[in-house]
Regions:
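Intrinsic disorder at enzyme termini
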Residues: 2-9, 18, 146-167, 184
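Extended low-complexity intrinsically disordered regions
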Residues: 5-49
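Structured beta-strand/loop patches that form or line metal/cofactor-binding pockets in enzymes
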Residues: 36-78
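Flexible, glycine/charged-enriched surface loops at secondary-structure junctions
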Residues: 42-44, 110, 131, 153-159
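Active-site- and interface-proximal helix/loop "cap" or "latch" segments in soluble metabolic
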Residues: 60-62, 70-137, 190
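Stable alpha-helical structural segments in soluble proteins, enriched in small hydrophobic residues
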Residues: 101, 138-153
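Compact, charge-rich alpha-helical regulatory domains located at protein termini
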Residues: 163-169, 173-191
C-alpha cells in the first residue's frame, strides 16, 4: 500500500509538503504508537536494572535513539525494553512497536530478536511512507547494538556480530546503509 500521494484539491494527508505537492498518510497503528508510545523511558527513571544499552544516530542529524534492555541471563529472553528518542513521529512509532514486539509473549530470545528486520516492524505498523523507512532501520540498529552490548557485558565476545549493511528492499537492492546515506545527503524519498 502506498502511503504517498499527489495532493488533490480538498484532500489532505496527515502530512503535506510545504509546496502542497505531496502528502502522506499514517496508519491508525502508527498514530497510536506515536500519540501513546509503549515502553517509553520517562524522565530520569533509574536505568540500573537494565543489563544492555544500545544507541544509534546523532541529534545533529535529526534522529538519535537510545534503548535499554533487561535480559534474563538464564533464558536470554528480553523481559524489559525501554527507549528514548530524539526524532520524528515515525521514529517514535517504529521504536514503540519494536519494544512491543521484543517483549510480548514472554519476550524474544536474543537470537530471535537479532532476526527482527525493519520490514517486520513496518508490517506490524501497517506500513510507513517511503520517506520514513529509515526510522524502522534506526530502531533495528539500536536493538542490535543493545544485543551486542549485552554480550560484551556478559563476556560472550564470540557472540558479538559486527554490523554490516542489511538488505531492506530486495527488489530495489537497497540496504540500510544506502538509506542512511541518502537521508544524510538530504533525500526525502527512495525514488
Amino acid at each position: 500500500m502506498s502511503h504517498v500521494q499527489k495532493a488533490n484539491p480538498g484532500t489532505q494527508g496527515d502530512v503535506t509538503t510545504k509546496d502542497g505537492g505531496q502528502s502522506w498518510f499514517y496508519t491508525d497503528t502508527v498514530k497510536d504508537h506515536f500519540f501513546n508510545p509503549k515502553n517509553f523511558l520517562k524522565g530520569e527513571e533509574d536505568t540500573a536494572r537494565f543489563n544492555a544499552v544500545g544507541k544509534v544516530g546523532s541529534p545533529a542529524c535529526g534522529d538519535e535513539l537510545r534503548v535499554w534492555m533487561r535480559v534474563d541471563p538464564a533464558t536470554e529472553r528480553i523481559v524489559e525494553f525501554r527507549w528514548k528518542t530524539f526524532g520524528c513521529g515515525s521514529a517514535i512509532a517504529s521504536t514503540s512497536m519494536a519494544s512491543v514486539m521484543v517483549t510480548e509473549n514472554g519476550g524474544l530470545t536474543l537470537d530471535e530478536a537479532r532476526k527482527l528486520k525493519p520490514q517486520d516492524i513496518m508490517e506490524r505498523l501497517g506500513g510507513l511512507p517511503q520517506r520514513k523507512f529509515h526510522c524502522s532501520v534506526l530502531c533495528d540498529k539500536a536493538l542490535r547494538d543493545a544485543i551486542n552490548d549485552y554480550f560484551r557485558r556478559s563476556n560472550q565476545f564470540d557472540r558479538i556480530v559486527a554490523e554490516a549493511s542489511r538488505l531492506v528492499d530486495p527488489v530495489a537492492k537497497v540496504t540500510d546503509k544506502d538509506i542512511e546515506e541518502a537521508v544524510l545527503e538530504g533525500a526525502h524519498t527512495i525514488e
